[in-house]
């Protein structure tokens, strides 16, 4: 060869691969399984995966720190808004409502959990929490105005149905072209769009149907306490 590369005093040979039409993480996982099954490296040789895959692994490691901090920040802001740990915890429950849909969205789109998908989850949680705040804050206001629990829940869901649906619908419709794109960059846009669209479907439905029930249960527990 025209050049012998070394790293840490050892010879190094770089094999480059261009991945097109599928996600990088899934390709590397499949390649690792095939190499482990069919290739036996001689003594003194080792194999490392670098390039974009290494960068993706580093980004995922950072996201594993950022995501818990994001959830804590959301909880803190909710507590500052409502001055109640119970209501903050109640609205935080929309996160699993949204995450369920996001996971199913990745599955049905044939995508894997990647950096774009993780960013999609963070965006999704923000929209889902916003819808939860819109609904619960109005129900809480009705209760303070003297409405009974049943009246507050019925009026709250009825009057906040359109704002919640509009917020979710606009976000979903804006991402539809990204979900069905197939050109360069689609490996980044498709996972993000799949997570947000599917997550908003489940979070919106469960926010309107389940969150009022949980609000009643939380308030009854507070009265008992």
Model-found features: residue ranges?
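Extracytoplasmic/periplasmic membrane-proximal domains and adjacent transmembrane bundles
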Residues: 1-70, 79, 150-152
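Non-catalytic alpha-helical coupling and interface elements of nucleotide-dependent molecular machines
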Residues: 20, 36-40, 68, 77, ...
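Helix-termination/interfacial motifs at the ends of transmembrane alpha-helices
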Residues: 64, 182-190
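Alpha-helical transmembrane segments of integral membrane proteins
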Residues: 65-68, 115-121, 191-194
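Hydrophobic transmembrane alpha-helices and their membrane-interface caps
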Residues: 73-159, 165-184, 198, 202, ...
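Structured binding elements
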Residues: 96, 188-193
């Amino acid at each position: 060869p025209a050049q012998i590369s070394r790293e840490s005093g050892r010879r190094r040979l770089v094999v480059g691969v261009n991945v097109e039409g599928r996600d990088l993480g899934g390709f590397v996982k499949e390649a690792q399984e095939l190499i482990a099954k069919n290739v036996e490296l001689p003594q003194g040789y080792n194999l490392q995966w670098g390039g974009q895959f290494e960068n993706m692994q580093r980004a995922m490691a950072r996201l594993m720190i950022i995501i818990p901090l994001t959830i804590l920040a959301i909880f803190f802001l909710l507590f500052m808004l409502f001055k109640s740990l119970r209501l903050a915890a109640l609205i935080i429950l929309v996160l699993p409502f949204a995450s369920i849909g996001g996971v199913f969205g990745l599955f049905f789109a044939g995508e894997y959990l990647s950096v774009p998908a993780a960013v999609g989850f963070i965006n999704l949680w923000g929209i889902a929490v916003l819808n939860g705040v819109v609904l619960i804050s109005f129900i809480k206001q009705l209760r303070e105005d003297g409405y009974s629990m049943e009246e507050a829940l019925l009026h709250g869901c009825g009057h906040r149905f359109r704002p919640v649906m509009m917020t979710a619908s606009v976000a979903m419709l804006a991402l539809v072209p990204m979900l069905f794109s197939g050109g360069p960059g689609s490996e980044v846009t498709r996972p993000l769009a799949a997570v947000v669209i599917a997550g908003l479907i489940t979070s919106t439905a469960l926010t309107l149907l389940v969150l009022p029930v949980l609000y009643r249960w939380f308030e009854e527990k507070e009265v008992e306490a």
